C-alpha cells in the first residue's frame, strides 16, 4: 500500500502489540503520568487496572468495539472465568439458548463430541445434555462494601446504595463531560475527581434522598488528589496487596459504561501525545464511595467484617463446573456453524466456473451486508466481478465540511488521519462564495434550533408558529424521499451540492505522493494488472430516523460515517489524468478507457446510487445504462432476500401467499417507509449474525450462499509471495472484524453491561457521548436489544469469528509469529483460523493444522 496508508496501518500494528512496547492499544500513554503522591507500586497497579477497560466511541462516531479487547492476552476461557467472578458477566449464551439449538438439531451429537475432544474435557456428552434441563445458579459480582450495607438495608422502603452510587456518579459525569446539551456544567479546571469531591461537599441531594447525613461530612476528609484518595481508601478498608488488583477491577466494573468513555478520552489523548487521567479519577470516585460508606467499625458483627468474610469463597479462579459446561456448549455451537460454512465453501470450490473477463468491477466494503447485494449483482452477468476491501478504501483522511469548522475522521477508529479532504467546485472563488452562503444558512438554522431547546419551547413551538410548523411535521412523518438529507448536504441547495465533490486540500500532498497512494490502493484492491472499463467504488451508509445509534449502522471502517466521501475521493484520484500518467513509475499502467465511478449502497433500503455521472465519458454511456438496470435488479433481489426477516415480503392485509407477494415497486416503497418511520426500532438488522471472515479471491466463495453472515476481503495469494498484504489484512481488517464480532457477541450475552438495553427508553447524554436507558443508571454502551432480538428470539447468534484464509500455512504462521496481538487472538481462542487446502479446509487448533472432514454436503452456511 502507499506510504501514507502503510504508515497508518503501521501505527495500528505497532500499537497492537501486547508486549513491552505498550502504546495506545493496551496502555494509553495518557495513563502513564500518574500522581507522584502515590507509591510507585500502587501507581503501576492502578495503571494496569485502568488499562483493562476498552474504549467506547461517541454516538456520532459509533464504531464496534470489543469490550474484551484488553483481556486477549489471556485465553478466552480464563477471561470468562474472571469476568464471571468480578462482575457476574457471562461470556456464553444461556443454556436455554443452547437447548433450543439442540432441539432444532442445529447442534448435533458430533459437534458436542468434537468440542469435548478439543478441550480434553472429563465431562461427557450425556452430562452436557442433562445440564440443559437443570436450573442455572445465579452469578454474583465480587462483593463491594456497598453490597453488604445494602444486605442490611430495608430495600422495600429505601433505595439501594449500589444503585444510588451509580446514579450519582453517572449524573455527575453526564454534567461534567457535557459540552452540547446542558446549560450548565461543572468547572473542569481542577479535574474529574477534585470536581466530584467539591460537589459532594456541597450537594445535599444524597443526604435528602438516602437519609444519610454523614456522607457530606466524610467527603470533606477525602484527599484532594485522586491517587492519594485511592491509597487512603485501600489502607482504610485493609485491602491486602494480593487482593488489590482484583478489588480495584471489581470497583471499576461497577461503573463500566463511564469507564469506557474515559478510556476513549485516554485513547484520543494518546493519539495526540497528551496525558489523560479521567479513567484514574473515575476509579478513585467509585472507590471513595466505599470509603464514605465505611462506618469504621471492625469488630464482630460489623459491616466490614461481614464484607471481608464474603470474600473467602471467592479467593481464586478455580474451575467452575457450570462455566465449563457453558463453554463446551458455546464451542459446540461454533463447530456446528463451522461445519456448515466449511461444507458450503468446499462445495463452492468444486462447482466454481471459470471466471470470464470482467466488463464491470465493483469494489464493496467487507461488511457482511455487502455479501447479499454482491451475490445478486454477480447473478446479473458472468462479466460482473465484485471485490471486497475495507470501506475506507485505504484513505487515511479527515473530512472537513465546506464553510464550517466541523470535521470528522473517515477511517477506522484504530487509526489517526494524516490527510484532509473537503468539498470543492474546483474553483477557489466559487468555493469561498459557496462557503459564505452556507455559513449564513447554518447561522439562521442554529438560531432557530436554539429556540427549540428553550425549556418552554416544547409547549409553545407549534402554538407560536401555527399551521406552518404543523405542516412541516406532517411532511416529515408522511413523506420518504429516496435519499434523506445528510450532514454533507446540509445547508446546500441541490444544485450547489451537485457542483461540489470531495477533494484533497492543498497540503504537502505532491503528485508523486498521490500517484504512489493510487498505485498501492490498486494493488491492494487486486486490480493492478486487470481492470474493466467501468470500476465501481461502492461505499455504504444507512438511512434511519429518530435513531441516536445511527452511526453504528454506517461504515465502521469510516469511523461510523457513510463511505460516500471515501468512494468519491478515491474515484477522483484514480480518474485524475496527471495521477494516471505518473502510475507507470510505480509499476502500474491503467487501460486508457477505464473509468472509476463512486457509488453508495444504502444498507437499509438496498438502493444503489452512482455519483458524478456527468463525468462519465459518452463512450461508456451504453455500458452505464446496462449497469443501471443490473444494479436495479440486484437491489430488488437483495430486498427480496431480506424482506422475510423484516416481515415485508407480503401484503399484511391478507395471509402470506404467492398471490399477495409485493411487486418490486411495492417492496421498494415498503423498505423506504421503514427507513423513514420515526417509531421503527428495527430499520435494518445491521451486522447481526456475523460469524466469519473470508480472506481469499471471490471465486473461492462465489457459489456459496453465505446469508449475509460473512465478511469478504479480496486476497490473491499468488500476487503476495512475501506476505506483506496478508500481514496488513490480518493486522488491520481482521482485527476490525473481530471487534465487530465481539461487540455483537458481548451485547448478546451480557446486554446489561455491554449492551444498551431497550431502545425505546434511550436518552442521549451530552449531545453525543452515549445513552442512558431511562434517566439514569450507568452510561450504556454497545447495541440495543432491538438490534439483536426480534421480540420472539435472538436474531444474533453469539459465535466467535471464524477466519478462512487462502494462503500457505507458513505465510499465515509468520504473521502470527511476528504480531503478538494476532497470536493471542488465535492461540487464546478469541477467534478461529482456517485455510483453504487442496479443495478442502483445515483449521488451526491447539497449535496444529487439522484437516476438516465433512460428514455432510450441505451447501448453505446458516
UniProtKB/Swiss-Prot annotation:
Keyword match Hydrolase: no
Source species, domain of life: Bacteria
Pfam families noted in UniProt: DabA
An example Gene Ontology molecular-function term: zinc ion binding
Membrane topology: Peripheral membrane protein
Range of residues in the leader sequence: none
Primary localization: membrane
Record has Nucleotide-binding as a keyword: no
Record note on quaternary structure: Forms a complex with DabB.
Role according to the record: Part of an energy-coupled inorganic carbon pump.
Family (UniProt): Belongs to the inorganic carbon transporter (TC 9.A.2) DabA family.
Protein name (record): Probable inorganic carbon transporter subunit DabA
Organism, scientific name: Vibrio cholerae serotype O1 (strain ATCC 39315 / El Tor Inaba N16961)
Name of the gene this protein is made from: dabA
Amino acid at each position: 500500500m502507499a506510504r501514507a496508508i502503510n504508515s497508518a496501518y503501521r501505527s495500528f500494528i505497532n500499537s497492537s502489540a501486547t508486549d513491552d512496547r505498550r502504546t495506545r492499544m493496551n496502555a494509553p500513554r495518557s495513563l502513564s503520568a500518574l500522581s507522584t503522591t502515590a507509591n510507585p507500586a500502587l501507581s503501576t497497579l492502578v495503571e494496569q487496572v485502568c488499562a483493562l477497560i476498552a474504549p467506547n466511541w461517541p454516538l456520532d462516531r459509533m464504531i464496534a468495539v470489543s469490550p474484551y479487547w484488553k483481556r486477549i492476552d489471556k485465553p478466552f476461557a480464563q477471561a470468562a472465568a474472571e469476568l464471571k467472578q468480578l462482575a457476574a458477566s457471562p461470556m456464553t449464551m444461556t443454556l436455554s439458548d443452547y437447548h433450543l439449538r439442540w432441539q432444532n438439531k442445529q447442534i448435533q451429537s458430533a459437534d458436542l463430541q468434537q468440542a469435548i475432544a478439543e478441550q480434553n474435557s472429563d465431562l461427557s456428552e450425556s452430562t452436557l445434555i442433562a445440564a440443559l434441563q437443570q436450573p442455572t445458579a445465579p452469578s454474583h459480582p465480587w462483593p463491594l462494601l456497598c453490597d453488604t450495607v445494602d444486605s442490611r438495608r430495608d430495600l422495600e422502603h429505601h433505595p439501594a446504595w449500589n444503585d444510588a452510587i451509580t446514579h450519582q456518579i453517572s449524573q455527575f459525569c453526564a454534567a461534567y463531560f457535557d459540552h452540547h446539551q446542558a446549560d450548565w456544567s461543572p468547572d473542569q479546571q481542577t479535574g474529574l475527581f477534585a470536581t466530584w469531591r467539591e460537589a459532594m461537599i456541597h450537594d445535599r441531594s444524597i443526604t435528602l434522598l438516602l437519609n444519610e447525613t454523614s456522607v457530606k461530612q466524610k467527603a470533606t476528609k477525602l484527599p484532594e488528589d485522586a491517587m492519594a484518595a485511592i491509597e487512603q481508601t485501600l489502607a482504610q478498608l485493609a485491602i491486602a496487596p494480593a487482593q488489590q488488583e482484583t478489588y480495584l477491577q471489581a470497583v471499576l466494573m461497577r461503573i463500566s459504561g463511564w469507564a469506557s468513555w474515559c478510556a476513549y478520552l485516554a485513547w484520543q489523548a494518546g493519539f495526540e501525545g497528551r496525558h489523560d487521567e479521567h479513567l484514574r479519577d473515575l476509579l478513585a470516585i467509585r472507590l471513595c464511595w466505599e470509603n464514605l460508606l465505611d462506618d469504621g467499625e471492625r469488630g464482630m458483627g460489623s459491616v466490614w467484617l461481614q464484607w471481608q468474610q464474603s470474600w473467602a469463597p471467592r479467593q481464586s479462579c478455580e474451575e467452575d463446573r457450570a462455566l465449563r459446561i457453558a463453554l463446551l456448549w458455546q464451542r459446540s455451537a461454533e463447530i456446528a456453524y463451522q461445519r456448515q460454512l466449511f461444507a458450503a465453501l468446499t462445495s463452492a470450490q468444486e462447482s466454481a466456473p471459470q471466471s470470464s473477463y470482467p466488463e464491470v468491477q465493483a469494489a464493496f466494503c467487507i461488511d457482511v451486508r455487502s455479501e447479499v447485494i454482491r451475490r445478486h449483482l454477480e447473478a446479473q452477468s458472468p462479466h460482473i466481478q465484485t471485490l471486497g476491501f475495507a470501506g475506507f478504501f485505504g484513505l487515511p483522511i479527515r473530512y472537513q465540511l465546506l464553510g464550517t469548522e466541523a470535521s470528522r475522521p473517515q477511517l477506522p477508529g484504530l487509526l489517526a488521519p494524516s490527510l484532509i479532504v473537503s468539498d470543492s467546485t474546483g474553483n477557489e472563488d466559487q468555493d469561498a462564495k459557496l462557503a459564505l452562503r452556507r455559513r449564513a444558512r447554518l447561522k439562521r438554522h442554529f438560531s432557530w434550533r436554539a429556540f427549540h431547546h428553550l425549556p418552554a419551547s416544547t409547549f409553545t413551538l407549534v402554538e407560536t408558529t401555527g399551521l406552518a410548523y404543523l405542516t412541516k411535521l406532517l411532511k416529515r412523518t408522511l413523506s420518504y424521499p429516496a435519499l434523506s438529507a445528510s450532514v454533507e448536504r446540509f445547508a446546500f441547495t441541490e444544485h450547489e451540492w451537485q457542483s461540489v465533490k470531495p477533494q484533497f486540500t492543498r497540503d504537502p500532498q505532491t503528485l508523486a505522493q498521490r500517484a504512489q497512494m493510487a498505485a498501492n490502493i490498486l494493488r491492494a484492491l487486486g486490480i493492478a494488472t486487470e481492470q474493466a472499463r467501468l470500476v465501481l467504488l461502492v461505499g455504504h451508509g444507512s438511512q434511519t430516523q429518530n435513531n441516536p445509534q445511527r452511526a453504528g449502522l454506517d461504515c465502521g471502517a469510516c469511523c461510523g460515517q457513510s463511505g460516500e466521501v471515501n468512494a468519491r475521493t478515491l474515484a477522483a484520484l484514480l480518474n485524475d489524468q496527471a495521477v494516471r500518467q505518473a502510475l507507470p513509475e510505480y509499476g502500474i499502467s491503467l487501460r486508457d478507457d477505464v473509468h472509476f465511478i463512486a457509488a453508495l449502497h444504502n444498507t437499509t433500503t438496498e438502493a444503489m446510487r452512482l455519483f458524478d455521472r456527468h463525468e462519465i465519458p459518452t463512450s461508456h454511456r451504453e455500458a452505464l445504462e446496462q449497469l443501471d438496470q443490473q444494479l436495479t435488479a440486484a437491489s430488488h433481489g437483495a430486498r427480496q432476500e431480506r424482506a422475510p426477516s423484516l416481515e415485508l415480503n407480503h401484503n399484511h392485509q391478507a395471509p402470506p401467499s404467492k398471490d399477495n407477494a409485493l411487486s418490486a415497486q411495492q417492496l421498494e416503497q415498503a423498505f423506504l417507509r421503514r427507513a423513514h418511520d420515526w417509531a421503527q426500532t428495527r430499520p435494518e438488522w445491521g451486522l447481526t449474525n456475523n460469524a466469519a471472515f473470508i480472506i481469499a479471491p471471490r471465486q473461492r466463495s462465489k457459489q456459496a450462499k453465505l446469508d449475509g453472515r460473512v465478511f469478504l476481503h479480496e486476497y490473491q495469494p499468488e500476487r503476495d509471495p512475501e506476505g506483506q498484504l496478508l500481514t496488513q489484512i490480518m493486522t488491520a481488517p481482521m482485527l476490525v472484524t473481530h471487534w465487530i464480532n465481539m461487540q455483537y457477541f458481548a451485547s448478546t450475552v451480557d446486554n446489561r453491561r455491554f449492551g444498551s438495553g431497550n431502545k425505546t427508553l434511550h436518552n442521549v447524554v451530552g449531545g453525543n457521548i452515549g445513552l442512558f436507558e431511562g434517566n439514569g443508571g450507568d452510561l450504556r454502551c454497545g447495541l440495543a436489544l432491538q438490534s439483536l432480538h426480534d421480540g420472539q428470539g435472538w436474531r444474533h447468534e453469539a459465535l466467535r469469528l471464524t477466519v478462512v484464509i487462502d494462503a500457505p500455512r507458513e505465510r499465515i504462521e509468520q504473521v502470527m509469529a511476528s504480531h503478538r496481538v494476532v497470536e493471542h487472538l488465535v492461540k487464546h481462542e478469541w477467534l478461529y483460523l482456517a485455510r483453504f487446502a487442496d479443495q478442502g479446509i483445515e483449521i488451526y487448533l491447539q497449535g496444529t493444522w487439522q484437516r476438516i472432514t465433512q460428514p455432510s454436503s450441505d451447501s448453505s452456511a446458516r
